[in-house]
Amino acid sequence: MTSPTNSTMLTYTTNNYYDDDYYEYSTITDYYNTINNDITSSSVIKAFDNNCTFLEDTKYHIIVIHIILFLLGSIGNIFVVSLIAFKRNKSITDIYILNLSMSDCIFVFQIPFIVYSKLDQWIFGNILCKIMSVLYYVGFFSNMFIITLMSIDRYFAIVHPIKRQPYRTKRIGILMCCSAWLLSLILSSPVSKLYENIPHMSKDIYQCTLTNENDSIIAFIKRLMQIEITILGFLIPIIIFVYCYYRIFTTVVRLRNRRKYKSIKIVLMIVVCSLICWIPLYIVLMIATIVSLYTSNIFRHLCLYLNLAYAITFSETISLARCCINPIIYTLIGEHVRSRISSICSCIYRDNRIRKKLFSRKSSSSSNII
């Protein structure tokens, strides 16, 4: 499986695709990037496949969706982070939710760069190109690791409540989250060697793209990232999720304890929504990888690659939508968040009533003077 790189942000030069012998695609991102730039011109598509239609407006629809996701995700996650950060008595679950929201913020604050790069140029320089590429992977790994930690914590809290209770402290939660962030950074750091700010067909336009170098080190890093994403970012977390929640479910059913079910509800919803948002991208990437093994030249199967590009774009947008869904889950299910929101709303309502009373008193006193 190839890696779910930030294909909406990173673009690829098309010169390589005009060579019939070039078909070793390092990541499925290349399919999208090629189509997203020069190959998206209607003249090129008509020249190679008259039966394949291209929707020029699709790119701008995706940009609008990304802007909406940025507004909702930034407001929601900043609210959750500020709410939990200033909470006095934080539980270990609060620590995990706080770090998960911070991980979502990494994706959310990349969206403006993604939107701008959809205009087919990168003006932010080579250093920021590398930083944003690494941050995407850091956000991906940290998101999966923290959700995994939340699942393990719920497993011990319900299946082994007495045996593992001394280890379920706030200090342990902070230590585990710091370890998850550090491991995410270590796993993501090789990406800085893969992406560069490279001039496009026009010398005045630069794009943050996969490097053109084909040495053994670059090839090794590409394979390494594919293995990391597939095994550490997907297979191992999925196995842990299935095992933990199977044991949790059997324990709750056996004990018939509604209180324990209520305690896992928010974590279970986060895990399920995250998987729903990530799995479509993985499926599309897997299909595209299989296709790349049996098709040697993009222009001979242009319509197929174009459809894969659209599928990757939409599935990537769904994965970003996760950043907006998590704050909604906290609000609907989390009792602390709901109570905090209600207290804030009541304070605002009370302040407005006080202002209205003061204003009416001033108005009446001024009228009496007149």
Swiss-Prot record:
One GO cellular component term noted in the UniProt record for this chain: host cell plasma membrane
Main localization (coarse): host cell
This protein's record includes keyword rRNA-binding: no
Stretches of the chain found on the membrane's Cytoplasmic side: 83-94, 153-171, 245-265, 322-370
Keywords of the record: G-protein coupled receptor, Glycoprotein, Host cell membrane, Host membrane, Membrane, Receptor, Transducer, Transmembrane, Transmembrane helix
Pfam families, sorted: 7tm_1 (PF00001)
Role, per record: Putative chemokine receptor.
Similarity field: Belongs to the G-protein coupled receptor 1 family.
Listed name of the protein: G-protein coupled receptor homolog K2
Lineage: Viruses, Varidnaviria, Bamfordvirae, Nucleocytoviricota, Pokkesviricetes
